[in-house]
Amino acid sequence: MTAAFYDLMDFDEVLEKYDPVMGLEVHVELGTETKMFSASSAHFGAEPNSNVDPVSLGLPGALPVVNAKGVEWAIKIGLALNCSIAESSRFARKNYFYPDQPKNYQISQYDEPIAYDGYLDVVLEDGTEWRVEIERAHMEEDTGKLTHLGGTSGRIHGATASLVDCNRAGIPLIEVVTKPIEGAGARAPEIAKAYVSALRDLVKALGVSDGRLDQGSMRVDANLSLRPIGQEEFGTRTETKNINSLKSVEQAITFEMQRQAQVLDDGGVIDQETRHYQEADGSTSKGRPKETAEDYRYFNDPDLPPVIAPREWVEEIRATLPELPWVRRARIQEEWKLSDAEMRDLINANALDLIIETVEAGTTPDEARAWWVSYISQKANESGVELDALGVAPAHVARVVALVSEGKLTNKLARQAIDGVIAGEGDVDAVVAARGLEVVRDDGAIEKAVDEALAANPDIVEKYRAGNTKVTGAIVGAVMKATRGKADPAQVNQLIAKKLA
């Protein structure tokens, strides 16, 4: 069911009547070499069911062994989120039956997580900060992946067959769970988006995950309930599952606020259920009834001992924490002498890390900003993808800047080179060669084009010689057209001035 089939309350009216309460659960795949409880490769993109073993397939007699690097990185995430680290935590079995869960249970953590009681301060679009409190960050294994065939939505409903890929089963996950986010009002969607963005930046800075929402290495479950203004008790929540972009997080929260408000206003009740986010129109659709913790029949996994994290080890890990994103931003703002507004623009465009890497690759901050915040951001918006998923790397931008500086590309040709990179035609040099983009250096060819343009525009020549030197734009344009944009505008202007002197 699409948004057009739902009655939605106007957003401003929602806020007059109801107070939203959010809870966000973010699953972060760790970038370890092997899985959480076995030696199979955890690398993304392998042939289906090639990275499997008896443990991840749940074969009888297979025993799990904890990935020590996964535990270390879980502690690292917990510390960066200002959490307390448990000296002893336990793995538990979360029991449920689903085709992508070969063992019919998931190894997770329940009442003894490795990290708890933390917070993450996030910066909103107007520069204000909001503290999101963290309930817990716990270790678990990922499930397999289902591909549904024959339906129209790509989901199990209406499908004629489902394919199971167990490569992902057993990959290390950290699930970061917030405490209820109250009092957000109209800013609830924005806070949700800012929190996920900040968490993504954090895990990337720590080097524990690539944070790719589009590839599923970060997945967001957004819980939302409404309560009448002034009421203390929480309403019934829904959980929108597996949201895979920052924009979608914002849209899903907004839609659920409007949908739930209309249901309540019409005298209906909110079902405690999971919901699916629909990329096409930003709506959510009904999933399944939402289980409670009791339904999962958690119990300590008898095959795994407690995870012991001595204080000395935790402090050793703390000492390895890199410069965290908010510290880095403050340093960059001071070094680059950016105003608060300029810094917010970079953060809101999710471009800061890309710009920093571009500067490290050899450009100036202004050159890097000009490309990422304008042309490349425009291309990302047109494609409906996040900036870092467009296919343009900092090295590509640094290369086109260098070619422009060397006079081998004009800005227009440089944009065409970036277009080729986005289209998957190779790196910048390969695109320039394949498309024949390099600036024309044949003085004879350019001089011929200038002569022809002057001959075709005698009125402009007359005005120029009468003292109006600003009229040569049409001549330059004609030359650029004749050379298919490959002439150097500075060289063209010099030739025009020389011939009209």
UniProtKB/Swiss-Prot annotation:
NCBIfam families: gatB, PRK05477.1-2, PRK05477.1-3, PRK05477.1-4. Heterotrimer of A, B and C subunits. It comes from the Bacteria. Its EC number is 6.3.5.-. SUPFAM superfamilies: GatB/YqeY motif (SSF89095), Glutamine synthetase/guanido kinase (SSF55931). The gene is gatB. Belongs to the GatB/GatE family. GatB subfamily. The keyword Nucleotide-binding applies. Residues 288-299 have a biased composition (Basic and acidic residues). PANTHER family: GLUTAMYL-TRNA GLN AMIDOTRANSFERASE SUBUNIT B MITOCHONDRIAL AND PROKARYOTIC PET112-RELATED (PTHR11659), GLUTAMYL-TRNA(GLN) AMIDOTRANSFERASE SUBUNIT B, MITOCHONDRIAL (PTHR11659:SF0). InterPro entries: Asn/Gln-tRNA_amidoTrfase_suB/E, Asn/Gln-tRNA_Trfase_suB/E_cat, Asn/Gln_amidotransferase, Asn/Gln_tRNA_amidoTrase-B-like, GatB, GatB_Yqey_C_2, Gln-tRNA_amidoTrfase_suB_CS, Gln_synth/guanido_kin_cat_dom. Keywords: ATP-binding, Ligase, Nucleotide-binding, Protein biosynthesis. GO terms for biological process: glutaminyl-tRNAGln biosynthesis via transamidation; translation. Residues 276-299 are annotated as: Disordered. Allows the formation of correctly charged Asn-tRNA(Asn) or Gln-tRNA(Gln) through the transamidation of misacylated Asp-tRNA(Asn) or Glu-tRNA(Gln) in organisms which lack either or both of asparaginyl-tRNA or glutaminyl-tRNA synthetases. The reaction takes place in the presence of glutamine and ATP through an activated phospho-Asp-tRNA(Asn) or phospho-Glu-tRNA(Gln). The keyword DNA damage does not apply. One of its GO terms (molecular function) is asparaginyl-tRNA synthase (glutamine-hydrolyzing) activity. This is Aspartyl/glutamyl-tRNA(Asn/Gln) amidotransferase subunit B. PROSITE patterns: GATB.
